[in-house]
Swiss-Prot record:
Catalytic reaction(s) noted: sn-glycerol 3-phosphate + NAD(+) = dihydroxyacetone phosphate + NADH + H(+); sn-glycerol 3-phosphate + NADP(+) = dihydroxyacetone phosphate + NADPH + H(+)
Record keywords: Cytoplasm, Lipid biosynthesis, Lipid metabolism, NAD, NADP, Nucleotide-binding, Oxidoreductase, Phospholipid biosynthesis, Phospholipid metabolism
PANTHER family reported for this sequence: GLYCEROL-3-PHOSPHATE DEHYDROGENASE, GLYCEROL-3-PHOSPHATE DEHYDROGENASE [NAD(+)] 2, CHLOROPLASTIC
Name used for this protein in its record: Glycerol-3-phosphate dehydrogenase [NAD(P)+]
Amino acid sequence: MKIAVLGGGSWGTALAHLLAGKGEDVRLWVRDPAVVEGVNRDHENPRYLKGLHLHEALRATCDAGEALEGADILLSVVPCQQTRSVLRSLRPRLKSGMVVVSASKGIETDGLRTVGEMVEEELAGLAPRYAVISGPSFAAEVVAGMPTAVVLGCADRDLGGTLREVFSTPTFRTYSCTDVRGVELGGAVKNVIAIAAGLSDGLGFGSNARAGLITRGLAEMGRLGVALGARASTFMGLSGLGDLVLTCTGDLSRNRQVGLRLAAGQGLDAIVAGMGMVAEGVKTTEAVHALARREGADLPITRAMYAVLHDGRDPRDMVQELMTRELREE
């Protein structure tokens, strides 16, 4: 099976490495020639996964046509905010009925669309068969062969079962479900809560506060998800609770790092410019806040993070507001 992987960041590279290790014919499409050279010559991604050895069968290219030629599966791992433009530019090269799997986590800020909705809109007429893979999975640990469990959402149960087998290895266990919307929203909203958790940790608020944020963040995730047609039970799984816990507590979490740096007094623009990788939660906060207002969903943590990130509010003031809201039943 030939698989075209779009996006040579840490997660795209990790999944390409995983699939190449299974014997799949994988082509990794990357815009940076230095990354292409590193993957093909040194079997390393020098920009995003420096020091980690990649499978020698993995090949990278800057040529989208080369990556897509004869591909059975398109695995999209480009940043969410770039997904629409990438799909639009590649559409003439895509065949009808192609399997498109997203491993990106976020919501488009302009149109408030999930990746699945963007695929449906941009590839209309090509009848793409869509799936999304998500869950608690730091890229470096996947490349290192550490045990990882994720979930693959696909409305077509049979296709979901096939893709589950494609992605599974002895160290990368893939479950499947049919709630595509729930899997996508869990992977997006958890990044907003992770920034809040990092901010809380950085301000020295302790373990109690972090646990409270994770738990109430899960409630917000489910509240918005159900309003948008997802199943509440999905958020108790790997793409919801699992990814939320990892992203709020793990030191490799980019979104948690944003919160920590905000707490240290750094400005948001400087943080984003200095990270070298995309922290999806910054843009996703804006999108989730807008979705909540549109759907009439009460998301107080998201509202507070929007005020901090986009209105310049003092984090300590927002914590005070969260803690002194009207009391209610859980």
